[in-house]
Amino acid sequence: MLNSAMSVVILAAGKGTRMYSDIPKVLHTLAGKPMVQHVIDAATKLGAAQVHLVYGHGGELLKQTLKDDKLNWVLQAEQLGTGHAMQQAAPFFSDDEDILMLYGDVPLISVETLQRLRDAKPQGGIGLLTVKLDDPSGYGRITRENGKVTGIVEHKDATDEQRQIQEINTGILIANGADLKRWLSKMTNNNAQGEYYITDIIALAYQEGREIAAVHPARISETDGVNNRLQLSRLERIYQAEQAEKLLLSGVMLRDPARFDLRGTLHCGMDVEIDANVIIEGYVTLGHRVKIGAGCIIKNSVIGDDCEISPYSVVEDAHLEAACTIGPFARLRPGAELLAGAHVGNFVEMKKARLGKGSKAGHLTYLGDAEIGDNVNIGAGTITCNYDGANKFKTVIGDDVFVGSDTQLVAPVTVGKGATIAAGTTVTRNVADNELVLSRVPQVHKQGWQRPVKKK
């Protein structure tokens, strides 16, 4: 039976000794963001009125990393078990709300599973998430009588008979705030570990005649925890496989789903094709018929219809209109903007630069702090010299300009419409419309020149 209000407690106090890291375990990343952030996001989507985060090791780093989230920070100075952690948060529980208990190192838990758990919670009872494992070694076993859940026995405290039980506790549960506070106050640490187990509340609830409803997740991997980097890497692959499956079923062509990483949010149009070893980070939008070549990295960018990004290009915080072509081996840095039909070729770098409609920068070029008009040709080896060691300056190039190879444009400088800049020119002054600009060192010819030779 569903109460109108619900808050969430996320346990995140563990150090994560087996990670062999100075970083708190829950801050290690999965799919580009901290594990605990996945759990916070799930709690938020579920509509939690408040999220209590129980922390201990690395508290300052946790607070700094999660500063944008609305959290109630609860200190667990000593790690004396899950029950002890919940006792620290208990003073913040309202009597008339449900409390959902989650873990910062169980990052794949889904909103759908949590909603089913919330819906299944009996009035005055407990909703408990359990799974059945072929090898339940090390996990707390679910004990039942006549099919009803009666308690949870930790592996270290279980009898040989109880250790044969395959149904195990995931640690995720939901109960009423008033009931939970009462049960937490009755817990003891009379067990092999000398800790306060949250699992003891199951037996306490059963003794009061309360119903415990067990719910299974859609996928066992939803409840997998992380204690070491091997487990984290396995969950990463599970997560990525799930994301790839969703994209394929929605019409996106992933040439090799096992070699695709989504570390953010991807929105795709129709007939999008993505080759192997592509990484998507942040918020990315791909229009209709976009093609992404092998080995590309796309981050926080919008790619318009019919664009093609050739292999091993990096696109970050950029905006491409329709029918642009990029790469191979191109780099678009933050602030790069390409208008319709523009082309950026191999070993071209753009930053805070706008390339107009139909304009081309085909090879070996740096365009920084630049505004480039339509139908402009940027020759190979062109550089906008935008930095004097202290300040950045802008280069403006008008429509229909032809820039020859090996040109340096020393900003601030403006090149007028229709101008032609000869190869090898260093432009230091503004150029008027339709002018030809060239700078040359006199070419010297020496007949009969004897090339120096090495002495033996």
Curated annotation (Swiss-Prot):
In the N-terminal section; belongs to the N-acetylglucosamine-1-phosphate uridyltransferase family. Mg(2+) binds at D105, N227. UDP-N-acetyl-alpha-D-glucosamine binds at residues 11-14, 25, 76, 81-82, 103-105, 140, 154, 169, 227, 333, 351, 366, 377. Binds 1 Mg(2+) ion per subunit. One of its GO terms (molecular function) is glucosamine-1-phosphate N-acetyltransferase activity. PROSITE patterns: HEXAPEP_TRANSFERASES. Keywords: Acyltransferase, Cell shape, Cell wall biogenesis/degradation, Cytoplasm, Magnesium, Metal-binding, Multifunctional enzyme, Nucleotidyltransferase, Peptidoglycan synthesis, Repeat, Transferase. The keyword Transferase applies. Catalyzes the last two sequential reactions in the de novo biosynthetic pathway for UDP-N-acetylglucosamine (UDP-GlcNAc). The C-terminal domain catalyzes the transfer of acetyl group from acetyl coenzyme A to glucosamine-1-phosphate (GlcN-1-P) to produce N-acetylglucosamine-1-phosphate (GlcNAc-1-P), which is converted into UDP-GlcNAc by the transfer of uridine 5-monophosphate (from uridine 5-triphosphate), a reaction catalyzed by the N-terminal domain. It comes from Salmonella choleraesuis (strain SC-B67). GO terms for cellular component: cytoplasm; membrane. It comes from the Bacteria. Pfam families: Hexapep, NTP_transf_3. This is Bifunctional protein GlmU. Residues 230-250 are annotated as: Linker. Disulfide bonds: none annotated. The lineage of its organism: Bacteria, Pseudomonadati, Pseudomonadota, Gammaproteobacteria, Enterobacterales. Residues 251-456 are annotated as: N-acetyltransferase. One of its GO terms (biological process) is regulation of cell shape. Residues 1-229 are annotated as: Pyrophosphorylase.
